[in-house]
Amino acid sequence: AITVSSSLFDLMSKRAPETMLRRPLSAYALKSVIDQRKEEGKPRLTFAHVFPHSMHAMELRYWLAAAGIDPSCDIDLVVIPPSLMVDALASGQIDGYCVGEPWNNAAVVAGIGRTVITSGEIWSNGPEKVLAVRKDWASENNDIHLELLRALSETSAWIDDMDNRMTVAQAISTPDYVNAPFDEVVGSLTGKNRQTGGELRIDMPDFNVFHRYAANFPWRSHAKWILSQMIRWGEAPDSVDVEHVAKSSFRPDIYCEAVRPLGVACPKSDEKMEGTHSHAWLLTEASRPVAMGPDCFMDGRVFDP
């Protein structure tokens, strides 16, 4: 999700109050603040993400650009580890950030930040974390690789059961993992995370999707979208062979080989149109029909791989 400081949130609300009442919340109010600061000769705002080549960085850039903000020159972008984001916001080192939970929720609970948009609102059911291994390791350890994928699939299915979320929250809130208060961790896992204004939202059951909607399937259309954004922002050359990179890095054939013994349904196609579904839908072109969630982008664009 993207969180801004409480002071910046107040400025956005004053500059463009009408845009702050609609979800998904666009960055037009932020653009108004940025334009005003330019006129007044004030320094650029600073936003943080966790790593240059990350979904968080791409989501932040996408959200900004959709409102006409050029993330390359209208603001300053910096890299900060997730666990240090809240302190950086509190100290004024940064004005906002894009990061995973519980670091958005933590800022809201502390009263220093407001979450303006979630990753799922920028791109519904877009990819987030991946399991990636070296090609040579996969070749040399095929059986282990397949078992690892099966274990991940079964674990994801278990975590996706809302009845197990409290147990997960208790486990990962400990010092050995996230090392954050249970109350800050449990919100996003149960779809009741705090958002703008610090109010409790109870209508985000798909805030975290671990297994349903073919969430573990490595869609090559996801890979191509990621590559398109890397090219867009100069992180990959225009000459990159998108088709080759997508096929060599995202391997649905290996995934399906691994999960087939578990009875997990697999799509028959390796890619799909992204952004064409605003509501739940049924994928029939699969080993058996798969209930799917929305895949729309916040700006209504469609990505054709």
Describe the predicted segments one by one.
Residues 1-73, 78, 95-108, 112-125, ...:
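Short, glycine-/small- and polar/acidic-enriched structural segments
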Residues 2-11, 127-143, 158:
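A bilobed periplasmic-binding-protein/Venus flytrap-type ligand-binding module shared by bacterial periplasmic
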Residues 60, 88-90, 230:
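Hydrophobic residues within well-ordered alpha-helices
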Residues 70-75, 139-145:
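Inter-helical turn/loop segments and adjacent helix faces that build the functional surface
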Residues 84-85, 103:
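Short acidic active-site motifs
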Residues 141-252:
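Secondary-structure end/capping motifs
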Residues 224-305:
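Conserved C-terminal helix/tail region of periplasmic/extracytoplasmic solute-binding proteins
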